[in-house]
Amino acid sequence: MSRTPGRRQRGFTLIEVMVTVLLLAIGLLGMLGMQTRASAVEFESYQRGQAVALARDMQARLLSSRGIVPGYLNPAISSVDGSVWVGNGSGAANFADANGNCPQPAPGDLASFAAAQACAWGRDLQGAAMRDSAGSIGAMVGARGCLIRIEPPQQNALADLYVVIVWQGIETRTDPAADSPAGRCASDVDFGPGQRRGISMRVLVPDLRKAA
């Protein structure tokens, strides 16, 4: 018995519908993948923007507080190897009081003035400047900040150091070189393979008395 043209047409129509559905599904999956990728790129960009702003904040603190710069050179606040850091994590230097507040500096004590500034910076790295009902949300994931001294410093400088911020990304990329400022800051913290992010700014605070 030969097949009727109507049955062949219905069979072809069903196949066409299935192919159309398959193509639509592939297209939707592609769009979803692109949207996910775009969201990841946007979040990475947001984190880097926050890090740049916070690094510039510490840069401004250093340049505008020339009188207390020697206090920043205290080994409890800065280091030459990135082992001293503030921000997130149990290994962070903690300058806060028992209530979690940054202490008031003691008059004439340069180290306590610098510690108060480092404490405030550490709180900002924890996202304290922006909060919701769940807690701090204004900073990068796992952010840590270091002041890495350059020794010997530039001639006629009160301080010569790197302001460094590291944090955890959400995409796998190339980690900073181990001997770079971003690789040395909080180097014992494992963010995961290819997920360490970092920026650094060299800050030179000149000794204006010698320059004159």
Feature locations, PLM:
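Flexible, low-complexity segments enriched in proline/glycine/serine and punctuated by aromatic residues
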Residues: 18, 46, 56-212
